[in-house]
Regions:
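Conserved catalytic core of the tyrosine transesterase superfamily
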Residues: 2-331
């Protein structure tokens, strides 16, 4: 029976699961997860349980199926995220003594194939970036930051927005690492950088110092007027550079995209680890943690390999993690 009225969507919970939801969220935050989106979704589940007058703690299979059912106009990604949350909560309930049904995550079919730059193409992009110049009518162009920015994207695999939101205090050139704060998964993480990349960052920092003195800018990547710039500006220069490097742009939704620096970093890193004799059983979890993913499965969309480029790596990966890259195996 559904209860009518009396329910207010907020951080307060009213169902039989209320106190346990709070414990669940706090248990995640202890490990650095902000869990803001999860908190909202848990509030919706709490309302659902309250409206359905749930009396016994423990998510039944029937309740899980009802909650996880696809909703009108709901995208595959949104539904998967919603199911992942209730799945995690059900697993938590099981761990603390309340048997619950742990639903399966809906299978997502993806035709997305990233563009993987060859090392030669990456080098051509970097060389071309060294010759970029601002237009005469736009002295405050972000162009002077682009050579360092793109090398950082390829050299670390971080996302463009993570790079553009770096503060000077987040770039540690003494110990060669950067700190990403409040990133996509709601937690801070430290990302090491190579000696050569640290030198590039140091040269850029020295070059930009004059602008920081004049405008008191805290952001690491800035324009000559001291102001930060967005991903749109970075993407504009990216399109220009791939043209200068002789790399064909195949259209919207196909690429190459700026985010493909992240995909390329992942593939090249796997290749390097394999060439150095590191077993794929160890290298995939290492890469997954480095990229800020919570599981090896999450690394799927970032490290798709093509049999043409890395057949040996693909074979090793398939043997250890079957179906991790299913769309490639079916070709």
């Amino acid at each position: 029976m559904r209860k009518k009225g009396g329910y207010k969507m907020s951080r307060y919970y009213y169902s039989i699961y209320g106190a346990l939801i709070k414990q669940f969220i706090e248990s995640k935050r202890i490990f650095g997860y902000k869990y803001a989106m999860v908190e909202q979704e848990c509030a919706r589940f709490d309302k659902y349980a309250y409206d359905n007058d749930e009396k016994v703690i423990g998510i039944s299979k029937e309740l899980a199926i009802q909650w996880c059912a696809k909703r009108p106009n709901e995208s595959v990604k949104t539904r998967r995220n919603r199911v992942q949350i209730i799945r995690a909560f059900s697993a938590y309930l099981c761990c603390i003594g309340y048997p619950s049904h742990v639903p399966q995550i809906p299978h997502a079919k993806s035709m997305f194939i990233p563009y993987i730059f060859s090392k030669d193409e990456v080098e051509k992009i970097f060389v071309a970036s060294n010759f970029l110049r601002p237009a005469e009518n736009n002295p405050n162009s972000a162009v002077f930051a682009i050579p360092c920015l793109f090398r950082l994207l390829y050299g670390t695999g971080i996302r463009i927005n993570e790079a553009l939101h770096l503060l000077c205090k987040d770039v540690n050139l003494k110990d060669n690492h950067i700190v990403l704060r409040d990133n996509k998964n709601g937690r801070d993480r430290i990302v090491p950088i190579s000696d050569s990349l640290a030198i590039v960052c140091e040269e850029y920092l020295k070059h930009s110092e004059q602008y920081r003195i004049n405008y008191n800018s805290e952001r690491f990547f800035i324009k000559p007027n001291g102001k930060p710039f967005g991903s749109e500006a970075a993407y504009k220069w990216f399109r220009k550079l791939i043209y200068e490097a002789g790399i064909s742009y195949q259209g919207r939704g196909i690429g190459p995209r700026l985010h493909d620096f992240r995909h390329t970093f992942s593939v090249h890193t796997l290749a390097s680890m394999a060439e150095n004799g590191l077993d794929m059983y160890y290298s995939l979890p290492i890469l997954s943690a480095y990229l800020g993913h919570q599981s090896v499965a999450s690394t799927d969309k970032y490290v798709r390999l093509t049999a043409e480029m890395f057949p040996l790596i693909l074979q090793k990966t398939n043997e250890l993690f079957p179906y991790l890259f299913p769309e490639i195996y079916k070709r």
